[in-house]
Amino acid sequence: MPSVRSLLRLLAAAAACGAFAFLGYCIYLNRKRRGDPAFKRRLRDKRRAEPQKAEEQGTQLWDPTKNKKLQELFLQEVRMGELWLSRGEHRMGIQHLGNALLVCEQPRELLKVFKHTLPPKVFEMLLHKIPLICQQFEADMNEQDCLEDDPD
């Protein structure tokens, strides 16, 4: 009957052989890959394509014309919110101020400004309305995406 020590030695030897075989296979594949004449060309092409891809993504993320339109929309929504609040229509004013929060680049800062400028009651109403406005915005965006995807 084999002892536990001999069984452990056998298991350790098998593990060492397996690790050695795996390492050898990795070295073999690396040499085969590096020996491929097209490898350096593909690597060079990939390295050249990375900065171009990054530039393309950067231009897609920041478009000055879109930024200007967002600023105009933001200012319009703030003005409409102030107008409705000055008329005593708190619900309409809060709706427009919430829309301004959606398109604002720094919504936390805008909330701080609203906290200091709006009456406490109106500010509380705005805070309670924010999740609903976000849900409505997401639903509108999903609907718009579905309409853009629909070929009809």
Swiss-Prot record:
Name of one Pfam family that matches: MAS20
Membrane-related topology note: Single-pass membrane protein
Cytoplasmic side: 30-152
Domain of life: Eukaryota
Keyword Cytoplasm in annotation: no
Entry keyword set: Membrane, Mitochondrion, Mitochondrion outer membrane, Transmembrane, Transmembrane helix
GO cellular component assignments: mitochondrial outer membrane translocase complex
Positions on the Mitochondrial intermembrane side per record topology: 1-9
Extent of Basic and acidic residues compositional bias: 47-56
InterPro entries attached to this UniProt entry: MAS20, MAS20_rcpt_metazoan, Tom20_dom_sf
GO molecular function, one term: mitochondrion targeting sequence binding
Record GO biological process: intracellular protein transport; protein import into mitochondrial matrix; tRNA import into mitochondrion
Stated family: Belongs to the Tom20 family.
PANTHER family: MITOCHONDRIAL IMPORT RECEPTOR SUBUNIT TOM20, TOMM20-LIKE PROTEIN 1
Location of the region described as Disordered in the Swiss-Prot/TrEMBL record: 43-62
Name of the protein this chain belongs to: TOMM20-like protein 1
Disulfide bonds: none
Membrane-spanning segments: 10-29
Position of the signal peptide: none
Subcellular location: Mitochondrion outer membrane
Broad class of where this protein is predominantly found: mitochondrion
